């Protein structure tokens, strides 16, 4: 039932995903203990997250092992574990060359993504992430010619319609290109999401 469409859902990796009745925004907060967010909510310093919790949906996802960005994010976006999607870590050892190879190429992702499945079924999909290495996997098989968008704040100054489905992102967001290792890199993602 891979990628099958029904009137109310899509199927991917043996899971049915209901067709949303209104636009859906997914924010993945990666790399932090949920206790930090919970404390911020108690302290009242995260009003927008509090609104997500109150008016929408929130969950703490079970992490995969090893606990690295690439395998966890690909598990979220494919709805499947590393044994299915193929991204088992941030690097793998090439048996022929003996080199460590970073696992960020979309060709290494063995599963379709939920994003591409919904886009193929007619939904308009926007994928924005901080770092471009992740953007390439998140945007795998996403048809940018049909109004879908996939870009990173890291390369927001380089976006083209052909590669990202959007251009002039810095102008749209109204912020300068953030430094790669700054908190503004993630803030840019959220600001871009609001503008789109």
Task: Pin down the residues of each PLM region.
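A general structural signal for short secondary-structure junctions and capping/turn motifs
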Residues: 16-18, 50, 66-67, 115-120, ...
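Glycine-/proline-rich flexible loop or hinge segments
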Residues: 31-35, 54-60, 69-72, 90-103
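Short, structured active-site-proximal loop/turn typified by the sulfatase FGly-forming signature C/S-X-P-X-R
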Residues: 37-79, 124-126
């Amino acid at each position: 039932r891979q990628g099958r469409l029904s009137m109310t859902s899509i199927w991917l990796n043996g899971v049915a995903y209901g067709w949303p009745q209104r636009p859906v925004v997914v924010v993945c907060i990666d790399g932090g203990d949920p206790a930090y967010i919970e404390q911020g909510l108690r302290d009242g310093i995260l009003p927008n997250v509090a609104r997500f919790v109150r008016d929408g949906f929130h969950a703490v996802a079970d992490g995969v092992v090893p606990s690295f960005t690439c395998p966890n994010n690909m598990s979220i976006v494919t709805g499947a574990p590393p044994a299915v999607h193929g991204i088992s870590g941030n690097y793998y050892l090439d048996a022929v060359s003996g080199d460590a190879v970073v696992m960020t190429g979309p060709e290494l992702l063995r599963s379709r993504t939920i994003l591409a499945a919904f886009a193929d079924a007619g939904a308009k999909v926007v994928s924005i992430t901080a770092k471009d290495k992740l953007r390439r996997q998140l945007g795998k098989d996403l048809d940018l010619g049909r109004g879908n968008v996939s870009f990173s704040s890291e390369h927001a100054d380089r976006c083209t319609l052909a590669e990202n489905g959007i251009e002039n992102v810095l102008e749209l967001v109204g912020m300068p290109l953030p430094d790669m290792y700054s908190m503004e890199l993630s803030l840019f993602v959220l600001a871009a999401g609001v503008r789109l």
